């Protein structure tokens, strides 16, 4: 992992998430550290323009949008990445306990959705943002916010994707659930890596993303489903993420979910 642009803040701590899991593998985010966390102290002056010149994708979430200076720094980072031709990936990852109130969270996320080329949310977040869980509402949200690629993860059922030209549910995989922490992050990584295989050499990655065929998108989401599924077969977040060899073997031998 390249940590060239990692910044240490002597006055702040790394934000921690505390996760409680049941014997069935279901999880609940019990709490986060909230006071003097380094991620909330990111400033525009911390951003290195050279970093974006060599990048292909910028991925961000909504926690950095809760308050300044991180909110303005995040928006500036998106602008800088866009200027350098990066794809913008956004997983709002709603954590209401960190926000002053739910309405501020909803408003902020809706305002920031148009910044992104790729947005990933789950069914609970879809209902939070639109008032319902129907996939038709997801397609309406994509159109309203002009999002080139919107993905709704559906737990064991897989994931739904919608672009301007295509929409489809891609089935998930049958697994023995151990613990689900890190599944969403793994899914995001699978999507980004899959997209880059198709669009990284294009002079206009956003246009290349929009031109992907249904079969190409289906293959990308299937791979992402595989990464997310494998992340659920081990305890922990980072330790559960698979190697390429593990992923290839899983995709070639595993059965899709019957749900």
Regions found by a protein language model. Name each.
Residues 45-53, 107-111, 138-141, 210:
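Short, flexible, glycine/charge-rich loop motifs used to bind or transfer phosphoryl groups or to couple energy/partner
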Residues 18-22, 104-106, 136, 166:
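Short low-complexity, flexible loop/linker segments enriched in glycine and/or proline
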Residues 1, 86, 237:
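Short glycine/serine/threonine/alanine-rich loop segments
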Residues 36-45, 98-104, 131-132, 208-209:
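Short gly/ser/thr-rich secondary-structure transition/capping motifs
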Residues 1-62, 249-259:
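Conserved N-terminal subdomain of the carbohydrate kinase-like
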Residues 79, 134-259:
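Conserved phosphate-binding/catalytic region of the ribokinase-like
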Residues 31, 68, 129, 170, ...:
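Residues that scaffold the ATP/ADP-binding catalytic core of kinase and kinase-like folds
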Residues 57-140, 147-149, 157-159:
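Conserved beta-alpha-beta core of the PfkB/ribokinase-like small-molecule kinase fold
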